[in-house]
């Protein structure tokens, strides 16, 4: 595993899929544009990208949040080259378990 590896997306967690499929068409378009962007990046590029806002979740090692659109953040984990999408949140605080 290297930070120079291309990012691979794993969108197969049922709780993530449920929220993703509930999005309206406009929001789906924005989120999928971010998925397309992520597939073109290496891990180092993800860490440096200011628009994605990759952040560690406090007190949860190995768990991070990433901005998918202006409205939505996802909670993700990294497994080798894979970014595993766990949950999707409308609000910033929800992604950090604060609500």
Go through each PLM region and give its residues:
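Residue-level detector of alpha-helical recognition elements and their boundaries
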Residues: 31, 35, 46, 50-53, ...
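A short, surface-exposed loop/turn module that caps and links secondary-structure elements
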Residues: 37-66
